[in-house]
Amino acid sequence: MNDLITNLALPQEVINAAGSNNGAGIGYGLVAVGAGLAMIGALGTGLGQGVSAGKAAEAVGRNPEAEAKIRLMMIIGMGIAETAAIYSLIIAILLIFVY
């Protein structure tokens, strides 16, 4: 019964690719999707760093005397936020090259 549903739902080329062991099967496709989803972490990091830099520029505009402290806190915050993007990149690379 399962073969009947598979044969009706999928073209023969897809079934052959899923059964082959040449790296082009559904398993590798799911790995690629997982790597892409892992890189969504970089999207959040980029947005967060952009907001952080904008707010720091506003704060320096309102209080120029505190520019050194504001810049230091912004750089520390961006460094902490960047670790999420680095971890996402490592996971994506591991998914692609280890599988």
UniProtKB/Swiss-Prot annotation:
One of its GO terms (cellular component) is proton-transporting two-sector ATPase complex, proton-transporting domain. The record marks 82 as: Reversibly protonated during proton transport. CDD domains: ATP-synt_Fo_c_NaATPase. It comes from the Bacteria. Keywords: ATP synthesis, Cell membrane, CF(0), Hydrogen ion transport, Ion transport, Lipid-binding, Membrane, Transmembrane, Transmembrane helix, Transport. Gene3D superfamilies: lithium bound rotor ring of v- atpase (1.20.120.610). PROSITE patterns: ATPASE_C. GO terms for molecular function: lipid binding; proton-transporting ATP synthase activity, rotational mechanism. It is found in: Cell membrane. The keyword Kinase does not apply. InterPro entries: ATP_synth_csu_bac/chlpt (IPR005953), ATP_synth_F0_csu (IPR000454), ATP_synth_F0_csu_DDCD_BS (IPR020537), ATPase_proteolipid_c-like_dom (IPR002379), F/V-ATP_Csub_sf (IPR035921). NCBIfam families: ATP_synt_c. F-type ATPases have 2 components, F(1) - the catalytic core - and F(0) - the membrane proton channel. F(1) has five subunits: alpha(3), beta(3), gamma(1), delta(1), epsilon(1). F(0) has three main subunits: a(1), b(2) and c(10-14). The alpha and beta chains form an alternating ring which encloses part of the gamma chain. F(1) is attached to F(0) by a central stalk formed by the gamma and epsilon chains, while a peripheral stalk is formed by the delta and b chains. F(1)F(0) ATP synthase produces ATP from ADP in the presence of a proton or sodium gradient. F-type ATPases consist of two structural domains, F(1) containing the extramembraneous catalytic core and F(0) containing the membrane proton channel, linked together by a central stalk and a peripheral stalk. During catalysis, ATP synthesis in the catalytic domain of F(1) is coupled via a rotary mechanism of the central stalk subunits to proton translocation. Key component of the F(0) channel; it plays a direct role in translocation across the membrane. A homomeric c-ring of between 10-14 subunits forms the central stalk rotor element with the F(1) delta and epsilon subunits. This is ATP synthase subunit c. It comes from Mycoplasma mobile (strain ATCC 43663 / 163K / NCTC 11711). The gene is atpE.
